[in-house]
Amino acid sequence: QLQSSAASDVYKRQHGSSFGVVPGDGREPITTDSVDATEIAIEFTFHGLYSVTAFGIDQEGHREDQVIEVMIEQHIDWYENDTGTPEEFVFDSTPGNEGPIPSHFLLNSTVQNPSIIDFDGRDVDVRWDVVNQEGVCQTAGENIGNGDTGFWKTLHFGPLSVHEIHLVIEDGQDRIDVHHSLEIIYSESG
């Protein structure tokens, strides 16, 4: 009896409890011994809705699982200063795990027409286009006075694919400052 108890204690020390996670993005499970750590950090590379399985294994080898829904959204800030030919801002709204598509993306775009000369500055006409594989899906234009700032805020529902934001100077001074702020957003219900 005494030997059996001692052997059991040795087994439990060598094979203690452990815990881990299955990230839900195709990676292998991440497991650690509870003696070595009390938490596991997971980093996701791509936006999406992930079903993460957290699990614990006791000293007798019994496993308990709990599924946790994790929502990873993406925020991108794109800047160009003193440009006469703004570059295309390209992003992919496809989820990184082949899961449900985003609810929408929100674009806040700011264009500044800096005042080069305090008197006799020029206006600039700009046009924004949101382009997907089917062509232009949204567009807007604005005349921005010398030293002024123009804004465009738009939503695009159910986006799934690569999108491009084109900003074109249609008329006026050559140099502008650009800031695109983009959020890829998922709904709570998936």
Predicted features along the sequence, with ranges:
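Single conserved hydrophobic/aromatic residue that forms the stacking wall/gate
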Residues: 1-7, 11
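Short acidic/polar micro-motifs centered on Gly/Asp/Asn
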Residues: 15-34
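Residue-level recognition of secondary-structure-to-loop junctions
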Residues: 23, 34, 38-46, 50
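Extracellular Ig-like/FN3 beta-sandwich strand-entry sites
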Residues: 47-51, 102, 160-164
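Hydrophobic/tyrosine-rich beta-strand signature of extracellular beta-sandwich/beta-rich modules
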Residues: 54-56
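C-terminal edge strands of extracellular/lumenal beta-sandwich accessory domains
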Residues: 60, 123-134, 159-190
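Low-complexity, Pro/Ser/Thr- and charge-rich linker/hinge segments at domain boundaries
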Residues: 72-93, 189-190
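Acidic, Ser/Thr/Pro-rich low-complexity intrinsically disordered segments
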Residues: 88-148
